[in-house]
């Protein structure tokens, strides 16, 4: 069984499939549809933006690429969110600052993604020493070195505003061997699939970030994973995530990100543990069942001629694996483990079509 990380082996933790009516899973996903999009891209919005594609050109390209949303995370400014072409049905509010820490002396990039436009400015204004935000639609802010405690305070402010806080391209930016330097705290996420400068998910950057995420899970950290192409050039769909939402608009996708109820990649993974959704924590009890379905695939990125498989993992290893077939469904008994999660893998080379997020147990 090939896997994206060539030297990584999942120990066996076998679970036998059980019969299920999938009523709990179907109830959780009732009224929700699969939407595809990238939380992290850049546009040519003027000012200090460094993307090559104007927002109005992004809107046209998204239809051709079968993308439902894009997070325009243009640097050092807020003006992109005020353009007439910024449509909140398709674009997400936010920006990508740099975190420059004093102790340890490390640099990171992170995303602040919001459900409403004014939240970003409120956070910037709440930290004058850290951003020196000039205010107003044309106001810019700076990347200023700060203590890690102030960075954590910014994170807390973002979360209080109902925003998402994401560690962007972590292994490509943070030069450290200490997991604590990659851990932005409870309620945050990190990018695993990183297709920047690559046409698809199987690339050295994804391998590095995916291994980091596995190490963080193994260390007991609750960390959500996402996918991105961090697109600065011609529009691409190489970094899409799959989000099941009852609404088709930016704030709804951000709410699912905050919950951790989504998966990286272009194949949708539906999963629950009894009534508990992806991204949640459940109290273990005897007789629980994990239910998984794979019904939705991106029409341009998924190749039905390839062979794919669905793997279900626990903290102790590979619990279940089966070929991906149309309308895939599997149920396994829940054992006393720390978490369960699922992924979809291309058989010939181990490339991930989807990396799901966990359901944790306590």
Residue positions per predicted region:
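A metal-dependent hydrolase metal-coordination microenvironment
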Residues: 4-168, 177, 185, 193-195, ...
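Short alpha-helical interface elements
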Residues: 86-87, 215, 282
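C-terminal functional module detector
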Residues: 1-34, 46, 55, 219-225, ...
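Conserved catalytic scaffold of divalent metal-dependent phosphoesterases
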Residues: 170-172
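Catalytic-core region of carbohydrate-active enzymes that cleave or remodel glycosidic bonds
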Residues: 181-184, 188-250
